[in-house]
């Protein structure tokens, strides 16, 4: 609904938002170093842990900025068709599996396997942000009063996210060799904390400081016509940070030379793609992929459109962004609680049980949007309104994480341990795409469904003529779409849900990939 600091199961999440846990780290052997050495303490590797944390913070900045643009566009009254087009920006993190083998296999040995991609990618990101800081006001129509150039913004931020996804691949790989085997578990913590902090800086903090109303109300003694920072200021600052820190990493941080590079790593590019095709052709995997690609259609209107509708109805975008902050403790605790119920042999039962509640919350979201203009008072909203929005969002998070954790548990359960990293990443990529494409379609359909139609149904055509062809009622496509999505969702739950649950009864052999050595 509103932008969330975590990127789970969401186009912004894209969450997320990037994606639903497509991390293969810790499933692969980090190397074949000298294990005769005594274990290294966490304190001994504190500098490496802090560097990893900072790299993940940098990674979260582009994610947060991209997540803030739809809210800025909505405040400028762009069409939902334009919003749908811009939503393609959030796809690269779900598609990075397509070029991840290339990043793993092609590098300059003398410079370092991971630095060969990390350093140029972050330099390009930094230069890109600095250049974009000179153009973004024009692209948003801030300088000449024109409508935003959505096509140019989409292309720009798509490249932005593509670079961030590539940086993510490089950092994930480096994390496995930068830390010793005893401390490699901290890599996932750095990832989670760093991305969350970066997303917070690029989304929540930026939207708050960019808002003149928020700054005048909470941060200033004298009102000003603009916020403390602008998007161009923000981009220039972080572009400079990218350039400076990347230079320091390139000069001062050396990769671990003790980690040997196996022969399979230098010629694994074609082998990896062949392996992916072999996995996806298995009947059980193919059935799972088709089901999970359609499972989230019922949530698409609620997840992709509701937050934009609230902005359209007058809710300040920075207030919506700040509502994500109290959700952070819940988002940390929920997976720990839910994992107790998904640890058994049938984790998808939780997915199936949570689905109808999440669908019904979609209707509750529609009611919330309908109610919003009725409680607006003197250009603002009472505190009880925000409490209700927060409670609605919290309930939504419970159902979302129940489904998310159960899918992750199932993916981990069925993945062939011999190729666990590739297998898990493929299943999680499909799960991410299952959330991305319905969100894009849902945004695209709002405008066509929003129309003053002359009694759309042919049976009322004669009555329409008697009324002179005039339109009596304008129906917002969001409400139509919300109802349609819920019907589709319950149809999927009733007819296809049992098929998804039945996959849990497949034997281990159904999920094992036969490899040609």
Locations of regions flagged by a protein language model:
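Loop-to-transmembrane helix entry/capping segments in MFS-fold secondary transporters
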Residues: 80-81, 176-191, 317-318, 386-387, ...
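Helix-to-loop junctions at the C-terminal end of transmembrane segments
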Residues: 95-112, 210, 331-356, 372-373, ...
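Intracellular loop-helix junctions on the cytosolic face of multi-pass helical membrane proteins
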Residues: 1-43, 127, 133-154, 166-167, ...
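Helix-loop boundary and gating motifs at the non-cytosolic
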Residues: 28-93, 286-313, 320-323
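A membrane-interface helix-boundary motif in multi-pass transporters
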Residues: 111-119, 208-240, 349, 444-488
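C-terminal ends and interior cores of transmembrane alpha-helices
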Residues: 118-146, 356-382
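Glycine-rich segments within core transmembrane alpha-helices of 12-TM secondary carriers
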Residues: 89-97, 125, 185-217, 324-328, ...
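Intracellular juxtamembrane helix-capping segments at the cytosolic ends
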Residues: 162-179, 400-422
